[in-house]
């Protein structure tokens, strides 16, 4: 009888210990940081509304990624002022003005402007400005203004290279008419690339005044590759950069593909 009682007590003790371990509450996960106690908004900066409507992360204010390239004479200071910090936003959205909903982050989120698919093509031929004629045939994983890259033959082709112009038009359309550089040179403004580089020659760019497309003036771009001997070439051959309005882009059907032509 005594042995049975001891066995029963031991069994009850083991059962209680097992019950205690199985019903133990899980430990709370703690992070050794405190979220910001004040209202903070990191607004996304975009060069225009069309690019902002693409819903792609571009850059935060005060970021140097939006500045123009320093390899050519470009209005870098003006761009830095234009892409500077934004004014304070009312958290309750009761003030007049910007009524967009803010997105609040507890910590910084970074995104690369260039993807891992960039420059994986032929460095001599370069990427071709070809897009599917029908979106249901195949869906390319590249984004034109992030992944496509011009090649050596396109740079050798000169200022008014057809493939270069088509590629730059496709990349610019993908970027919402906000592409800043192509082939190492910045897209020119209404004054033209020659005036931005401080060149003085007997000939002037073909288009001196920006044409009006609706109510907005058309922007200009150039496929001039950086590193070309522009001064010598312009003096010896009389070649000048050819300018194409970025907004004047139409679609031509060539076989089974669509090519954006400027």
UniProtKB/Swiss-Prot annotation:
Key words, A-Z: Signal
InterPro entries registered for this protein in UniProt: DUF5850
Presence of keyword Signal: yes
Pfam family, one: DUF5850
Signal peptide range in chain numbering: 1-22
Record family assignment: Belongs to the IIV-6 117L family.
Protein name: Uncharacterized protein 107R
Organism (species): Invertebrate iridescent virus 3
The organism's taxonomic lineage, starting at the top: Viruses, Varidnaviria, Bamfordvirae, Nucleocytoviricota, Megaviricetes
